[in-house]
Structures are given as structure tokens and as C-alpha cells.
Regions:
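Short, charged, surface-exposed loops that flank catalytic or proteolytic processing sites
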Residues: 138-144
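Short, well-ordered beta-strand elements within core beta-sheets of diverse protein domains
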Residues: 132-138
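Glycine-rich, aromatic-lined ligand/substrate-binding cores of catalytic
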Residues: 225-351
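Short, well-structured alpha-helical segments that form the helix of a local strand-helix-strand
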Residues: 145-154, 304-308
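A contiguous strand-loop segment
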Residues: 2-128, 148-281
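Substrate-recognition/cap regions that form aromatic- and gly/pro-loop-enriched pockets
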Residues: 313, 317-446
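Histidine-centered catalytic/metal-binding microenvironments
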Residues: 426-494
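Short Pro/Gly-enriched beta-strand edge/turn motifs at strand-loop
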Residues: 61-65, 146, 322-330
Length: 494
């Protein structure tokens, strides 16, 4: 998927949480309806079969409950996308990334080949459709997640290049696939955040650690030999550069990928480097933008949402701008675009008991014109307003209401944007208050069953809050757009 990812280490966050967040975007020319659900252990089969690649994989016999953000319309696979399991391990997958012909020629992608004549079909590898479903129900730590996915990649291969994030309450790991069967993973420094557009991102990798203590680096068992055999190390100074070895540096990256990383870094570290002008240290076309940085201030969920909603506001590249050269507006691919299906931010809060730690923040449709809502993840069901999405447009669905608000507000941006700003502020403030209230109620309750019931009650209250505010905002932006119709006429009989 054409996505954008932001990871926040525990010492870089405002409250010591690990946070992983990703915009899940549809490809150009279509939209994918999504829903927020809980998948129970009994819903997992003994053998998984991919819809797209037809690969069959036996599953362990002890799956855990997990949340997921699957496709609302069946037929093309599950695409679970993001979630938290009962062990408080979070995962988001995948960020589609890039590679180069040297890698893809040395370790080709494992692509499904349909039957032809007397030749039987050849199953493909695993991909975004499958990865969360194959990994999340069976893992107890972020590191264990990397190890499980790594074994699956080595065994079955993949038909696409992907980046995947894993977290527990203590740490975050980021894994990138390399060709059909290889991979590398790096632990996110606790004091840093990571920005990821659709491009291989890891900018430094310690092979000695990966094949030694494995404190901060893990990789496929033969990666060192693979690099040497196919002459992938391009460094002149003896310091291995994984981007040069495994990644891409194309003209399209400078329009589609590097500008997004530039804006995220520029927002969270505005004075660390010079980001604009002829003397800029980094520009939207820079290939050496850092994979991770220590932020200038602690990062909140609201900061994450702002960054993942970017349309280059405050720069000449904002498609909504009324200033600057017209030819610069919209020249780069925005982070908050029309094709955002959802954003999921998974927050694991270390200062609370285990059953309260996991909060999953969810928003649907274009991030530039929506609102994000927190929900407890350690629950048995999710509210119908988020879980009941279908392929039919409905105001009873948070997904569809969000799509309508975004489309109408975009078409009447000058008059509607302040309605959306008030909507987002109101939702975040009210839902923060509800979360604080229900945290306190649970901390005062010693009965685990009662605490679980309070989480269910809280999620219904949060959904009711956003449903009312979304309906009010839809009414307002509909009025603004209707008032600006081309057949509008000022004279009336009333």
C-alpha cells in the first residue's frame, strides 16, 4: 500500500509510551473501505491460505485475541493492517518500500504463477494481505515478532517489498524486506522517532551486531554472504550503507517519497537543521534524510496525527495554499491525501496496569480533514460505528461519514476547514476526557471482570461522542458546499 509510517520510542514520547502509527492508503484510482474489529482465537484456521498468492501456511495452535483493521468488503483477502494482541504487542503492516534491480535480480520476488495448460499453479510468497494475520496472534514481544516474520520470509518468500513495525511496552522494531527472501530489522532508539515514506529507509546497519549480540540489529541468516556474493556494498569508506545496497534513488522518489520524510523531520525538529532556502542542510529531494532523529520536544499522539495529516502546510507546496507560486502547489505527494483509508496509532502506556496499557487511536479517510479517536484495545468487541463498515455508503459508519466530510470539506476548503478544525479539537478534547475518566474508574476497580466491562463501556461512550460530533460537522460542511453550488441564486421568495 502507498502508506506513511511514524514510530516513536518510549523516551521520545510524552508519557513513556511506545507509539507506532501508519496511514493505510489505497492505490491510485480506488478507495478501500475499512473496519475496526476484534479477532477471537477461534476465528483463526489451522492452515492459512492466501487469496492473492494461494500460499498455504500451517499456523501454530495457540493464537491470541487481537484487534485488526481489515477490508470491509470481502473477496481480496483479510488485509488486517494494524492491531494489538492480548499480550500487548502491537503491529502495523505494511509500508510498501522500494528496492533496486541488483537486489531483485539476485533474490527475485516470489510471485504467484497461475496454472497454464498442463503446468500447475505455483503459489507466491506472503504479502501485505497476510502478514499481520500470520504474525500478530502468535507473538509475545516485539523482538519475537521480528524473528517469526523473518522465518516466514525465509521459508515462503514475499512477492513485494515491505516495511513492518512491531512494538511492546519496552521497545519498537522495524523490519524491511530485501528481495524475495532476505530481510533486516533495526531496533528504534528509545530517545528517537522514525519517519518512513514508501522507500527503503534504514540508513545504517551494524552487521557485526546482527551476527553477534543482536542487541539492536537482526537479519536473515545469510545476509552477509548475500551482500558479498552480489557486490551490493557500494560504500567507499568501509561503512556499510543499507540504503545504497538495497534501496532506490529514483527521480520519482524525489516527488513521491523524500518530500514526505523531509516534512515530517522538519516538523518535529524545526531548528536542528536548515530545511529551506539555498543554504538548506536537507531539501525535499535529499536522499540522505535521517531515518531517525531525537525530537526537539516530547511527541504526543496529537503530534503524530498532525504529521500524518500533512499537506505541506506552511510551505510553497501546500495544494490548498493561496500564496506563493501556483506551479509549486501540490507538486509533491502529500501525507494526508484523498486516498487515506485509515490511520491507526497504537500506544502502549507503561504507567498503567497491563489490561489498560493498550490504546488504539483510529481515524478514517483523508487525514487532512478528519478526527482521530482513542479506544481501549484489550476488549472483546468494538463499537458498531467502527466495526460495521460495509461497501454501502451509510451515515451509521464512521468510515463513510469521514469520507463524506473530507470530500465536501475539500471542495469547499476555504469555508469548511474551520469546521473541521473545531471538529478535530472537540473530538480529541472530549475523548481525552473520557479516557481519563475511564482510566480512573478502572484503577479504582479491583475486579478484573468489572474492569473489562468498563473498557467496553468506555469504547461505546467514545464512539457515541465522535458519532454525534461527526454528524454535526457533516451537516456544517454540507451546508457550505450546498451554498456554493454553481446554480446558486441570491433572490428568493422568503
Amino acid at each position: 500500500m502507498a502508506c506513511t509510517t511514524l514510530l516513536v520510542g518510549k523516551n521520545a514520547s510524552y508519557d513513556g509510551s511506545t507509539m507506532i502509527a501508519r496511514n493505510d492508503d489505497s492505490g491510485s484510482g480506488h478507495f478501500t473501505a475499512k473496519k475496526f474489529v476484534v479477532v477471537q482465537p477461534e476465528e483463526h484456521p489451522a492452515v492459512y491460505r492466501s487469496v492473492l498468492s494461494h500460499v498455504e501456511i500451517p499456523l501454530p495452535g495457540d493464537p491470541m485475541r487481537m484487534t485488526a483493521m481489515p477490508n470491509a468488503v470481502e473477496g481480496k483477502g483479510i488485509w488486517a493492517a494494524a492491531g494489538v494482541n492480548a499480550a500487548n504487542v502491537g503491529m502495523t503492516a505494511t509500508e510498501t518500500i522500494t528496492s533496486n534491480p541488483r537486489v531483485l535480480g539476485a533474490d527475485p520476488l516470489v510471485v504467484y504463477q497461475p496454472a497454464r495448460g498442463e503446468r500447475p499453479e505455483v503459489p507466491g510468497g506472503i504479502g501485505e494481505e497476510d502478514i499481520v494475520y500470520l504474525v500478530l496472534p502468535y507473538i509475545h514481544t516485539a523482538r519475537e515478532s521480528v524473528e517469526r516474520l523473518g522465518k516466514l520470509l525465509e521459508t515462503y518468500g514475499t512477492y513485494e517489498m515491505n516495511g513492518i513495525a512491531f512494538q511492546d511496552v519496552n521497545e519498537i522494531w522495524w523490519l524491511e524486506t530485501i528481495g524475495g527472501h532476505h530481510w533486516m530489522a533495526r531496533r528504534v532508539p528509545d530517545d528517537s522517532y522514525v519517519v518512513m515514506p514508501n522507500q527503503l529507509g534504514i540508513d545504517a546497519f551494524d552487521l557485526d551486531d546482527a551476527f553477534g549480540a543482536q542487541e539492536n540489529h537482526l537479519c536473515s541468516a545469510d545476509l552477509r554472504e548475500f551482500i558479498a556474493k552480489y557486490h551490493l556494498d557500494l560504500a567507499q569508506d568501509g561503512v556499510f550503507d543499507p540504503r545504497a545496497a538495497f534501496g532506490s534513488h529514483t527521480d520519482s522518489d524525489h516527488v513521491y517519497n523524500t518530500p514526505r520524510a523531509w516534512y515530517m523531520l522538519r516538523t518535529l525538529n524545526p531548528t536542528t537543521w536548515v530545511w529551506d532556502g539555498p543554504d538548506a542542510d536537507y531539501t525535499p529531494a535529499s536522499d540522505d534524510l535521517p531515518w531517525c532523529m531525537v525530537p526537539e520536544k516530547k511527541i504526543t499522539p496529537e503530534d503524530v496525527k498532525y504529521v500524518l495529516s500533512s499537506h505541506y502546510q506552511g510551505t510553497p507546496y501546500d495544494p490548498y495554499a493561496s500564496y506563493g507560486a501556483r506551479e509549486n502547489r501540490g507538486v509533491y505527494r502529500s501525507i494526508g491525501i484523498n486516498r487515506n483509508d485509515f490511520v491507526a496509532l497504537i500506544q502502549l502506556r507503561p504507567d498503567l496496569p497491563a489490561d489498560l496499557q493498550a490504546v488504539e487511536w483510529v481515524a478514517y479517510a483523508s487525514n487532512a480533514l478528519n478526527a482521530m479517536v482513542p479506544f481501549y484495545a484489550n476488549v472483546e468487541t468494538t463499537p458498531a460505528y467502527l466495526a460495521g463498515t460495509t461497501g454501502e455508503v451509510s451515515t451509521d459508519s464512521f468510515y463513510w461519514v469521514s469520507r463524506m466530510i473530507a470530500a465536501m470539506a475539500d471542495a469547499s476548503y476555504g469555508k469548511s476547514v474551520f469546521h473541521v478544525e473545531r471538529y478535530e479539537l472537540g473530538v480529541l478534547s472530549a475523548c481525552r476526557a473520557l479516557l481519563n475518566q475511564y482510566d480512573a474508574k478502572q484503577l479504582a476497580e479491583t475486579d478484573p471482570a468489572r474492569r473489562a466491562a468498563l473498557r467496553q463501556e468506555a469504547n461505546e461512550a467514545l464512539a457515541a461522542e465522535v458519532k454525534a460530533r461527526a454528524a454535526d460537522t457533516l451537516d456544517k460542511v454540507l451546508f457550505e458546499l450546498s451554498s456554493n453550488m454553481k446554480n446558486a441564486y441570491s433572490r428568493s421568495d422568503m
